[in-house]
């Protein structure tokens, strides 16, 4: 089948974790780097092998400079469901596209990658020898080759039922690897300043990619905590800032979250985290502030808002306020005063967040946030809605047998008007989502039932 325009076929080798997050990440990144998402497969599902149509090798390389969901990308020369189909496909690949990488002055090596099966060395050599019909003119160099070619075999997803023959076989020229090493180099275990709910490094980079963060963007986190999401954005050259209602967290005070450490040190703060990774120049500031009462002037400031609001499980949901009938006026409080706080219903928190994003994001800017859900009752109608924001993706991460959190990505498609502020009250999504006010109770009721069941089994 002829490809549209000047598109070339590439094979993506995907990582087998966070499966739902992979497609939105690739789509978002392609739109950032000037590509357009078109595919030659109807669905990707859980397979680690994706075939993409991409305009140029430069775009393929730029994609791999950002993605943490993909391991490698290859220029696809041929594929089939059997060795014979693969060889037929390779023989039909234009020779003029092969020659630049196979001439006599070049060096190369051929690698074998199998998914869900291990081959013996003898089997690997047999597969490589079968490619002798390709016009390789260069010399083999296993240590520092100019060009690397790969045979990739897919034996399905079931480790308990591995077929004798692969479902699909691919052959291509290696182009580049993804950024999987960032997950280790930015690991929370190695981070100077952490909290109880510091975001996993891999998920932080996925959120940043879903938000289409790019160099010189302004990124904001209204529930900043220890700033893990800011670090991922700063890595890609964005300027970062945030707010949090917790004075101790913002200033790096109070009890430490690390084992065998009682109190936080004098230099444990968000700025020190960015300094640790050489990213301090991208740090603007972090403020003690209440997300339910934004203190920003009217206007569109942010290219992206990326956040992980508290769910009331490991961190409390709070807003400033008082139970008294006549709370003390803020104008009477000294500058150093930290207001008392009230509980902050989850539904109110998320609708406040959407309103804030609609008011302060630039047109085309993205809001990326986590939404906790009680799985037995979840429906798509529960995802908060706003007339200025369009839902881009909704990806699930399971937390337990009965709870999950969903990574919601929204894009601003319309300028904010005052009448939009309370439009959610008229939405069909409002009443279903109010049930999330009891997410904490449902979470702990599930935990209690599980513990009781385990205790009952242990006594039988």
Curated annotation (Swiss-Prot):
Q: What is its EC number?
A: 2.1.1.214
Q: Which PROSITE patterns match?
A: N6_MTASE, SAM_MT_TRM11
A GO cellular component entry from the record? cytoplasm
Q: Any keyword Chloroplast?
A: no
Pfam families for this protein: UPF0020
Per the record, the major location class is cytoplasm
Q: N-acetylalanine: which positions carry it?
A: 2
* CDD domains registered for this protein in UniProt: AdoMet_MTases
- Where does this protein reside within or beyond the cell? Cytoplasm
- Oligomer and partners: Part of the heterodimeric TRMT11-TRM112 methyltransferase complex; this complex forms an active tRNA methyltransferase, where TRMT112 acts as an activator of the catalytic subunit TRMT11.
In the record, the note on similarity to other proteins reads: Belongs to the class I-like SAM-binding methyltransferase superfamily. TRM11 methyltransferase family.
Q: What does this protein do?
A: Catalytic subunit of the TRMT11-TRM112 methyltransferase complex, that specifically mediates the S-adenosyl-L-methionine-dependent N(2)-methylation of guanosine nucleotide at position 10 (m2G10) in tRNAs. This is one of the major tRNA (guanine-N(2))-methyltransferases.
Q: What's the protein here called?
A: tRNA (guanine(10)-N(2))-methyltransferase TRMT11
């Amino acid at each position: 089948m002829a490809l549209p325009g000047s598109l070339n076929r590439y094979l993506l080798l995907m990582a087998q974790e966070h499966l739902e997050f992979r497609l939105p990440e690739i789509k978002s990144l392609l739109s950032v780097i000037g590509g357009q998402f078109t595919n030659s497969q109807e669905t990707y599902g859980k397979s680690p092998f994706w075939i993409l149509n991409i305009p140029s090798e430069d775009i393929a390389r730029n994609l791999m400079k950002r993605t943490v969901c993909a391991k490698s990308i290859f220029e696809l020369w041929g594929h089939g469901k059997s060795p014979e189909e693969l060889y037929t496909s390779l023989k039909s690949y234009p020779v003029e596209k092969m020659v630049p990488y196979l001439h006599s002055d070049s060096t190369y090596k051929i690698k074998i990658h199998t998914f869900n099966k291990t081959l013996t060395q003898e089997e690997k050599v047999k597969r490589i020898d079968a490619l002798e019909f390709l016009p390789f003119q260069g010399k083999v160099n296993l240590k520092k080759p100019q060009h690397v070619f790969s045979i990739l075999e897919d034996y399905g997803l079931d480790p308990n039922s591995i077929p004798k023959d692969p479902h699909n076989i691919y052959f291509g020229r290696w182009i580049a690897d993804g950024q999987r090493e960032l997950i280790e180099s930015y690991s929370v275990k190695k981070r100077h300043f952490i909290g109880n709910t510091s975001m996993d490094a891999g998920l932080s980079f996925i959120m940043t990619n879903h938000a289409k963060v790019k160099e010189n963007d302004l990124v904001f986190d209204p529930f900043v905590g220890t700033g893990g999401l800011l670090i991922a954005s700063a890595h890609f050259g964005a300027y970062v800032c945030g707010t949090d209602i917790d004075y101790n967290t913002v200033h790096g005070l109070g009890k430490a979250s690390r084992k065998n450490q009682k109190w936080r040190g004098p230099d444990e703060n968000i700025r020190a985290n960015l300094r640790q990774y050489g990213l301090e120049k991208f740090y603007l500031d972090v403020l003690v502030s209440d997300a339910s009462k934004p203190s920003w002037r009217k206007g569109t400031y942010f290219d992206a808002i990326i956040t992980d609001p508290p769910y009331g499980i490991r961190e409390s949901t709070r807003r400033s306020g008082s139970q008294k009938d006549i709370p003390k006026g803020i104008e009477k409080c000294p500058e150093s005063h930290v207001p008392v706080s009230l509980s902050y219903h989850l539904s109110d928190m998320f609708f406040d967040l959407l309103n804030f994003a609609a008011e302060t994001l630039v047109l085309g800017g993205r809001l990326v946030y986590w939404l906790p859900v009680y799985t037995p009752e979840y429906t798509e109608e529960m995802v908060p809605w706003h007339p200025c924001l369009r839902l881009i993706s909704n990806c699930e991460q399971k937390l337990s047998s009965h709870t999950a959190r969903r990574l919601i990505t929204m894009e601003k498609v319309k300028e904010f008007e005052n009448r939009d502020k309370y439009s959610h009250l008229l939405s069909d999504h409002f009443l279903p989502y109010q049930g999330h006010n009891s997410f904490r109770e449902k979470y702990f009721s599930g935990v209690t039932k599980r513990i009781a069941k385990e205790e009952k089994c242990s006594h039988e």
